[in-house]
Amino acid sequence: MKPLFVFECDLVEGRQVRCMDINQANPDLVVVGYGEFDINCTDDSKLKPGLLCFWTLKNPNFPEKIINHEASITCCQFSKKAPHLVAVGDSSGNIAIYNIRGNDTKPVAESKDLDFKHTDIVWDIQWVQRENKGESLISISGDGKIIEWSLRKGLEYTELMQLKRETNPNQKDVYAGAEIEKKSGGMTFINTGGLSIDFPQNSEQNITYFAATEDCTIHMCSMSYSEQYLETYSGHTGPIYRVRCNPFWHKDDCPIFLTCSYDWTVRVWSAKEPNPKLTCHQIETLKQQVNDIYWSPNTSSVFASVANDGRIEIWDLKKDNLAPVKTYFDKDSDGKEINTAKTVVRFSRNSPVLLAGSENGKVGVYRTLGLEHVQVSERD
C-alpha cells in the first residue's frame, strides 16, 4: 500500500470519522460523516454537532460541499437510484435525507418530529430496492428496532423487527445495553441493540437480510416476518460492529458474509451454517477490536479491515485465512507507527484505491498494489 493524500480540514478538528460512502454514479465523490463521541458525557448538547463533508478524489484539498447536522453522524449512504440523495443516521436516533443538488443544506425529510422514530443511536442504514415499492431506506438502532422508511410522502415508517436477545453459548458476560426485565427468579433479557445490517446483493426481491447485534449474534431475517428469525449465527464473544455480504458469492442462493467484532476477530460465514466457516485474525499480534470491514468490489475473495490500534489489513481468502496479505500503519515523520484508531474502510469502485477514516477526523487515501481484478467466473 502506498499513501497518496489525506482528506482533512480545520472544520473536522475534534470530530471522529464515523462513516463513509462512495457515490455509484460518480465514483470520485466520497461522503464522510463526522461526530464527537465521549462515553463519559451525559449531555449530547455539550458535544460538537455532526458534519457531513463531500470530498472528491480529484480535489483532496477541501470538501466540495459541507452540511452541518444537529447531532453526531453515525452512518450515511448515497441512494442507488437517486445518487443526489444521501441518507444519514445520528446519535440522537434521527434519520435525515439530504439533496446535494444546489446550495440548500437543510434535509428534505427527517424523522425527528415523527411520533414513531428510533429512541437510540442509529448505527447503520441501507438503501434497498423493493419490488413494486421502489427504493426504501432500512435502519437499525441501539433501541433494537429495524425500520423501513419510504420516501413517497415525506418519511413513512414500517417496523420490520424488534430484536430479541437469543442465548449465545460464546457470550462471556457481554450484555451491552440489552433491556432487562427483573423477575423473582433472576433476570430475563428481552430486547437487544442492533449495530449493523446488510442485504445479499443477489436477492431479487431484497426480502432477506442480516442483522448484527450487541449480544454477539447475527440474525438472518425476512422482511415478510417480523416475529421470528430465519436463522441465528453464534461465534463471536463481543458486540458485532459490522456485517457485510459478499457482492459476488451467491451460489445456490447461499450468501457468504463477513462480520467484525469487539472480540478482536473477523469471521466469514455461510448463510446455511450457523457456525463461522473461517475466523480471520493474527493470533499473535491482533489484540484490538476490529471496527470495520469491506469487501473488494473487484475480487470476490478480498476484503479490508481496520482496527483500534490504527492498522489497515487486506485479506485474500484464496491465499490465506489466518493472516492478511498486507498490514499497514500510518507513520510519522520519524518513521514510527501511528496508532490512532481507524474507524471506517472502503475500496474505490473505479480505481486501485482504498480509503480509511480515523478517530482524529482524517481520511487517508492509499493506492493498493498487487490486487488482481475479478475474473468473470467469480461473478457466477
Each model region followed by its residue ranges:
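Loop/turn-rich, solvent-exposed surfaces of beta-rich toroidal or solenoidal domains
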Residues: 251, 268, 287-320
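Acidic and/or Ser/Thr-rich intrinsically disordered tails and linkers
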Residues: 1-50, 54, 106-109, 135-136, ...
